[in-house]
């Protein structure tokens, strides 16, 4: 997606060979026009997949997930990282390790929002080692729902997340596939 590539080149900051900072437009400050384009693109890619729900993890996946849900006309559910007094029922949950934050946390969704008849599209800001995606897949399976695909805004292709998801037979659509961050330069798989 050329608009996303351009934004990454202009405003992304390479912090190391492993870490790309995109807080200027995606995971701190949000560019609404770019999110609209991202939602349009994911909706086009998955329009014939029978999606009934979109699932993401708070917080950075919420903006692209909402725009995709708006385009597809389906609800968006975000897995919470922190317990809430309003989440009182037996939750669908999984643990996830954050590569960027270097911490493990439990994410949870109320079972009232996912059913066995749902076809779920996972939307996330990044795909690195695939741990967040695997946690969401686990939660969706706990509900008996079907994972219809994964929409990733930025994939770090040099890490193993996509290979793992591919080997499990999941459809993965990434809007920007980063080949390398070596030398402080973002190189894309075109």
UniProtKB/Swiss-Prot annotation:
Xanthine binds at residues 20, 27, 156. Disulfide bonds: none annotated. One of its GO terms (biological process) is purine ribonucleoside salvage. Keywords: Cytoplasm, Glycosyltransferase, Purine salvage, Transferase. GO terms for molecular function: xanthine phosphoribosyltransferase activity. Pathway: Purine metabolism; XMP biosynthesis via salvage pathway; XMP from xanthine: step 1/1. GO terms for cellular component: cytoplasm. It catalyses: XMP + diphosphate = xanthine + 5-phospho-alpha-D-ribose 1-diphosphate. It is found in: Cytoplasm. InterPro entries: PRibTrfase_dom (IPR000836), PRTase-like (IPR029057), Pur/Pyrimidine_PRTase (IPR050118), Xanthine_PRibTrfase (IPR010079). Coiled coil: none annotated. Signal peptide: none annotated. 5-phospho-alpha-D-ribose 1-diphosphate binds at residues 128-132. Its EC number is 2.4.2.22. It comes from the Bacteria. Transmembrane segments: none annotated. PANTHER family: HYPOXANTHINE/GUANINE PHOSPHORIBOSYLTRANSFERASE, XANTHINE PHOSPHORIBOSYLTRANSFERASE. Converts the preformed base xanthine, a product of nucleic acid breakdown, to xanthosine 5'-monophosphate (XMP), so it can be reused for RNA or DNA synthesis. HAMAP family: XPRTase (MF_01184). NCBIfam families: PRK09219.1 (NF006671), XPRTase (TIGR01744). Homodimer. Belongs to the purine/pyrimidine phosphoribosyltransferase family. Xpt subfamily. This is Xanthine phosphoribosyltransferase. It comes from Pseudomonas fluorescens (strain ATCC BAA-477 / NRRL B-23932 / Pf-5). The lineage of its organism: Bacteria, Pseudomonadati, Pseudomonadota, Gammaproteobacteria, Pseudomonadales.
């Amino acid at each position: 997606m050329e608009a996303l590539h351009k934004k990454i080149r202009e405003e992304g900051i390479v912090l190391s060979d492993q870490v790309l900072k995109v807080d200027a437009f995606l995971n701190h400050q949000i560019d609404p026009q770019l999110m609209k384009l991202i939602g349009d693109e994911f909706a086009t890619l998955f329009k014939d997949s029978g999606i009934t729900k979109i699932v993401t993890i708070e917080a950075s996946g919420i903006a692209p997930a909402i725009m995709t849900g708006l385009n597809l006309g389906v609800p968006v559910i975000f897995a919470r990282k922190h317990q809430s007094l309003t989440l009182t029922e037996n939750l669908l949950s999984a643990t996830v390790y954050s590569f960027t934050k270097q911490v493990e946390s439990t994410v949870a969704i109320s079972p009232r929002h996912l059913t066995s008849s749902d076809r779920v599209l996972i939307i996330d800001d990044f795909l690195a080692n695939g741990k967040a995606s695997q946690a969401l897949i686990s939660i969706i399976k706990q509900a008996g729902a079907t994972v219809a695909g994964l929409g990733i805004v930025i994939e770090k292709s040099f890490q193993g997340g996509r290979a793992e998801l591919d080997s499990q037979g999941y459809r993965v659509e990434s809007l920007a596939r980063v080949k390398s961050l070596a030398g402080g330069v973002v190189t894309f798989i075109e």
